[in-house]
Amino acid sequence: MSNSWFQFKQFTVQQDKTAMKVCTDSCVFGATVPVTTSTYTILDIGTGTGLLALMLAQRSNADIDAVELNKDAAQQATDNFFNSPWNERLHVHTCSIQDYFKFTTKQYDLIVCNPPFFSASLKTGNTSKDMALHQSHLLIDELIQVVSFMLKQSGDAYLLISIYEEVNFFQAANRVGLNVKRFQEMYDNETKLIRYVLHLRKDTEHMDHETQNFIIRSADKQYTAQFVEVLRAFYLNL
């Protein structure tokens, strides 16, 4: 059973009210998404506990909007934000991203999302977990359309996706004229590929030319030097 909280160096993530708990791949994502001094506004789509927003708040001075459909998860994220050092820059919106898009004209320097995945797999029977894991409430095309409209002309979007869904995301991006590239291949160990991170932009000027490989654990099941370097600012015992 997962703990009801996860303690980081600068903040705590309470997670007893949310279906999806803090996991290693999300932590890697939050620690490796590029942010710069020009990243003033960030949108976190499907924030859950607020983990990604909190990690990006620690890494930047940006103002961050976090959208979450599930009311319990949104309340948990609100509490986690309030108890963090960056509560004045973190804002939860309890609605679907489709509804949020309808009621705002705001565009963002950076958009991040760990979207629903395993669309072809069987559902668990747990409604909250199914909503978090499956694409019932957020289709790939809808997500990409929202990203296209809400991303600044010079902005960047990064999506943490299942390795089985990459073709669908590429096709959806092409349909709305977004440039898309595989930014990162994430491995649990040297041979076990677990996730892709996609990079989307409206232009190709600042697209990364080489895909990064990120390996979490070595053959002896210890964290790699790469992992320790990136997560040291967050994990207590690194």
UniProtKB/Swiss-Prot annotation:
EC numbers: 2.1.1.223
One term under GO cellular component: cytoplasm
Gene3D superfamilies: Vaccinia Virus protein VP39
Major localization class: cytoplasm
Keyword Ubl conjugation: no
Subcellular compartments: Cytoplasm
Gene Ontology molecular function, alphabetical: nucleic acid binding; tRNA (adenine-N6)-methyltransferase activity
UniProt enzyme class: transferase
Reactions it catalyzes: adenosine(37) in tRNA1(Val) + S-adenosyl-L-methionine = N(6)-methyladenosine(37) in tRNA1(Val) + S-adenosyl-L-homocysteine + H(+)
Family matches, as InterPro entries: DNA_methylase_N6_adenine_CS, SAM-dependent_MTases_sf, Small_mtfrase_dom, tRNA_Adenine-N(6)_MTase, tRNA_adenine-N6_MeTrfase
GO BP terms: methylation; tRNA processing
Keyword tags: Cytoplasm, Methyltransferase, S-adenosyl-L-methionine, Transferase, tRNA processing
Family annotation (HAMAP family): tRNA_methyltr_YfiC
Job description of the protein: Specifically methylates the adenine in position 37 of tRNA(1)(Val) (anticodon cmo5UAC).
Record-stated family: Belongs to the methyltransferase superfamily. tRNA (adenine-N(6)-)-methyltransferase family.
Record's protein name: tRNA1(Val) (adenine(37)-N6)-methyltransferase
Native organism: Cytophaga hutchinsonii (strain ATCC 33406 / DSM 1761 / CIP 103989 / NBRC 15051 / NCIMB 9469 / D465)
